[in-house]
Amino acid sequence: MTKSELIETLAQQHAHVPVKDVENAVKEILEQMAGSLSSSDRIEIRGFGSFSLHYRAPRTGRNPKTGETVELDGKHVPHFKPGKELRDRVNESIA
């Protein structure tokens, strides 16, 4: 599901709310989450999961076109850990 599909689905489920308001709400939620992560804050949504940053150490990579080795810097990457309720719900629907 893309962001625009999410906005469309929410707008259909809440027909009394203007689509522009739904779009602004979704964008604001995502912006707040991105801001929290960029400040190294952990985000926990009970029953859904948590977002945090994981550090990837520097490493030697390879350019796939030339085969040349390249030194890659260490960096922080967003990580999502699903909560138990989400894991259970997904497993029930797939099984």
UniProtKB/Swiss-Prot annotation:
SUPFAM superfamilies: IHF-like DNA-binding proteins
GO CC field: chromosome; cytosol
Function of the protein: This protein is one of the two subunits of integration host factor, a specific DNA-binding protein that functions in genetic recombination as well as in transcriptional and translational control.
Stretches the record annotates as Disordered: 56-95
GO MF annotation terms: DNA binding; structural constituent of chromatin
Quaternary structure, from the entry: Heterodimer of an alpha and a beta chain.
InterPro entries for the chain: Hist_DNA-bd (IPR000119), Histone-like_DNA-bd_CS (IPR020816), IHF-like_DNA-bd_dom_sf (IPR010992), IHF_beta (IPR005685)
UniProt source species: Pseudoalteromonas translucida (strain TAC 125)
Name the UniProt record assigns to this protein: Integration host factor subunit beta
Ranges of compositional bias, category Basic and acidic residues: 72-95
Similarity comment: Belongs to the bacterial histone-like protein family.
UniProt GO BP: DNA recombination; regulation of DNA-templated transcription; regulation of translation
Keywords: DNA recombination, DNA-binding, Transcription, Transcription regulation, Translation regulation
Superkingdom, taxonomy of origin: Bacteria
